[in-house]
């Protein structure tokens, strides 16, 4: 699960109203299109509303929130959205130090250096959402 830290973030949100993906996309993931990084937060109804890993089929519209509009704000992200280097895990994340960057598969990976361009995140706190989670500051925009 990926959540905004404060509801006021929706007041300044930038949504691409015509964003579609050429491939299937998992809800609650990250997607970069045309150099813009989005967090995909579609509203899901019915039986799938509270399930993890709900797939939005290729060609369907996406609620893609442009992360550049939220620079300096925070997201809360479950650990399941983070990939680690071999042998590393949640215990290796250090608040105030660990950096994360989006991967092409929609998850975030731990990185030791900030990318030269594009959105990345700095872990500010370790918290609990539906399990182990982190609060991240949106940076690099």
Residue ranges and their predicted role:
Residues 1-141:
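Surface-exposed, low-hydrophobicity beta-strand/loop segments enriched in small/polar/acidic residues
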């Amino acid at each position: 699960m990926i959540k905004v830290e404060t509801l006021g973030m929706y007041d300044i949100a930038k949504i691409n109203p015509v964003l579609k993906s050429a491939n299937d996309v998992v809800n609650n993931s990250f997607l970069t299109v045309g150099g813009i990084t989005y967090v995909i937060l579609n509203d899901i109804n019915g039986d799938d509303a509270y399930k993890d890993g709900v797939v939005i089929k290729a060609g369907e519209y996406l609620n893609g929130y442009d992360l550049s509009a939220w620079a300096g704000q925070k997201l809360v992200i479950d650990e399941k959205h983070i990939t680690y280097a071999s042998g590393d895990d949640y215990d290796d994340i250090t608040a105030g130090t660990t950096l994360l960057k989006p991967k092409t598969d929609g998850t975030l990976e731990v990185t030791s250096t900030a990318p030269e361009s594009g959105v990345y995140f700095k872990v500010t706190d370790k918290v609990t959402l539906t399990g182990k989670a982190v609060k991240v500051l949106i940076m690099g925009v």
